[in-house]
Amino acid sequence: MDKQNTDSEKRATAEAPPQSLCTLVSSSEQGGMDITNHNAKAGAADEYPHGVRLAAVVFSLMLGMFLVALDNTILGTAIPKITDEFHDLNKVSWYGSAYLMTFGCGFQSTWGKFYKYFPIKVWFLVAVFIFEVGSLICAVAQNPTTLIVGRAIAGFGGSGVGVGIFTIIGFAAPPENRPQLLGFTGATYGIAAVLGPLIGGAFTDKCFYINLPIGGVAAGTIFLLFKPPTSASPAKATPKEKFLQMDLVGATLMMGLIVSYILALQYGGQTHSWKSSEVIGLLVGFFLFVLAFVTWEIYQKERAMIVPRLFMRRYISVGSIYMFFFSGAYFIILYYLPIYFQSVYNSSPIGSGVKMLALIIPLTLAAIVQGWALSKIRIVPLFWIIGGALGTVGCGLFYTFDTETSVGKWVGYQIIVGFSTGWTFQIAMSNAQVHAPPEDMSQATAIVNFFMTVGGAFFISAAQCAFSNQLIKTITKNLPELDPTVAISTGATQIREAFTASQVPIVVDAYMVGLKAVFAITIAAFGVATVIGFFGSWKKLLADELEKATGGVA
């Protein structure tokens, strides 16, 4: 079996529950693993690390997953403070979109090809190094542009780290133990999701320094203790074929269309009129990039980052489109709830992180329950519809937020949205793993993940556009003597210091109007996702199909 198929197998076990690390080490030390013919080429048992070496490798992979997960959640509560330092609220969408754009928009497929055709260990260390460089740039950034560039570099490196973790797992333990390793990484992701808002709130603009020692330990451990088995040797191909497999043209076109889209929404109604040549030109460029990207991917066929043959299959297309809208709504909430708490409630960054635990803890618990529930219910659209409907209701309740919303309400509403997100987020990936044949599994899961991250980048930008336009419109109407750009350039946590006592309530109300526009977008996104969920296959999954997606532990 080539490396791509091995990668497919280890991805297919992602829903397995975590088990004790001691149990894993012990079972690995016993040797004599029963490896099936299907997985025989994943490496002989004596090539796998054992004992302390295995524990160290697993620990380093958990650190790597912690890094990737933390960077998805740490920034939300830090953003309002960062806007204070840079005096620019208008760049908020870029702080999130820049990372998501390079983290998932085609580059996961590219990194997968790197791990297939080049030494795994070397390129994993390269990915960690790139991520660390991006984090360092973010940490020392003195202006928004530098921070955005750092976020983009970190996203590209983080994409390689994420793909590399799952690839190394495929060669760090025999097939029957891989679900346990994936369970550890899954648990680590949940821990990072909980700690991210707290760390971001506590360290605010210095939060990026945290990545440096963690990444250093992870890279050092892999460098010293992980020895790739002979089965992990790079796949044979000509230099030309290796280059073509990267689909760098597709990745470039995708970057072009996302940048055009983000800039159009950033300029429109804020620094330029919607009818200006700049905005119209960017929107036209966006649609031309979309057309070019689709045409190129069809032409590339099996070399494409989005293989047309796979995307036309219902279990991938419906799940991918569903997650485009669903994850878009989730990322908006992750980035704009802290702004609500810090601007309207005057919470500190760490205070807003504590308040968001009402969202993150139910999300994590629901994600754990979801794996068990899927093995019992086995009807995928039910999860999509329930999750989307709860998200729609929860965000509808978010829309009722005002400057005097009680604690009970904002806690309860977050619990609803958190549960809906955790209940649903992994279903599309599991469904792809269930139905895709082994040779297509890595590509199938990559397509679903691609749409998840692109959805985040698109909807964060749309939310920022709506927020800024409504903020400007409201201040212009209710406080005409104040230049709206002053409110935009004032950080969310500096409202009460930057404006007079008579102006503060009006500016806070303007923030609330902008946030209501943001929440309206999440209502629409969750609602569209709910409708799309009805188009999934209602055929009940078979037990052996679920075993395929959970490594035989469903």
From Swiss-Prot:
Keywords: Membrane, Transmembrane, Transmembrane helix, Transport
Biotech exploitation of the protein: Griseofulvin is a spirocyclic fungal natural product used in treatment of fungal dermatophytes.
An annotated Gene Ontology molecular function: transmembrane transporter activity
Localization per Swiss-Prot or TrEMBL: Membrane
Transmembrane segments: 54-74, 93-115, 120-140, 152-172, 181-201, 206-226, 248-268, 279-299, 321-341, 349-369, 379-399, 410-430, 447-467, 518-538
Family matches, as SUPFAM superfamilies: MFS general substrate transporter (SSF103473)
InterPro entries (alphabetical): MFS (IPR011701), MFS_dom (IPR020846), MFS_trans_sf (IPR036259)
Pfam families linked to this entry: MFS_1
Membrane topology: Multi-pass membrane protein
Gene3D superfamilies named among the record's database cross-references: MFS general substrate transporter like domains (1.20.1250.20)
Cellular component, GO, one term: plasma membrane
Domain of life: Eukaryota
Function: Probable efflux pump; part of the gene cluster that mediates the biosynthesis of griseofulvin.
Family of this protein: Belongs to the major facilitator superfamily.
Full protein name: Probable efflux pump gsfJ
Gene: gsfJ
